[in-house]
Amino acid sequence: VSSGGTGPSYNVPSAIAVTYYYRIILTDITNGCDDPAPVVVMIQVEPQPAVTISASNTNLCIGGTSTITSTVTNGSGFLSYQWQSSADGSTWANITNQGNGASYAVPTGSANSTYYRVMVTDAANGCNDPVSSSVLVVVQPQPAVTISINNPVVCIGGSALISSTITNGTGNFTYQWQSSPNGNNPWTNISVNGTSATYSPPTGVAGSTYYRLVLTDNGNGCADPVSSALQFVVQPQPSVTIAVNNPSIC
């Protein structure tokens, strides 16, 4: 080493990530003294650490599960973690309960919208302590569904529309309309046009039919609610007859 390499200590350059091997050659100038064998050491200069996070579920229902996992690149590997939460993404607080691991299990016992991030501390000399970007996890109330019909009684050939109203849930829904002749079991899935948010019941034959909607929320931890049933009646077309009491008079 040409610069600074003749003293009892040496400052290793750390501007770039590289592996160095160093040895010291000691010369004892006293007459008759042996020169000890060189000692070799390895110095590893690592790139500065960086951290990213990802959540298994960012939109879920109460009681579901979401785990946020951190991925650290570079650095020395001598790491410690501090997870933080924020209601608005700007004011942060340390998470004291289970908030010091490489991953974090989001609490889902109540509906909330919370931002999360992790601070990583690298214990090696000269290493930065990176902070991840944030991820928003929304815990929704369980979904519920109701249905209504614009014309509960029509004549053959008329028209009606059954509409659904959904509250809460993640919004990632699928629909299955069902029919029953009496409002009790068995309920039969409607295969023709029966998988939308609304349903137009057939009116070609007179009769009474009950309808309901089975809603599937595809979010993690979400229940699949079933609406109450409503009755739809198709009446025969009206007909009229007349009679006269005295068909012939003076």
Model-derived segments and their meaning:
Residues 1, 23, 83-86, 117, ...:
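Conserved Ser/Thr-centered positions that define the repeating blades of beta-propeller domains
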Residues 1-14, 84-108, 178-203:
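Surface-exposed, flexible coil segments in extracellular/virion-facing regions
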Residues 27-34, 121-128, 216-223:
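Short, solvent-exposed loop/turn segments at the edges of extracellular beta-sandwich modules
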Residues 41-47, 135-141, 230-236:
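Interdomain boundary/hinge segments at the C-termini of tandem beta-sandwich modules
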Residues 47-55, 141-149, 236-244:
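Proline-enriched interdomain boundary motifs that mark the N-terminal boundary
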Residues 58-64, 152-158, 247-250:
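Short, solvent-exposed loop/linker segments at the N-terminal edge
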Residues 64-72, 158-167:
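A short beta-strand segment in extracellular, disulfide-stabilized domains
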Residues 72-85, 166-179, 183:
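Solvent-exposed loop segments of extracellular immunoglobulin-like
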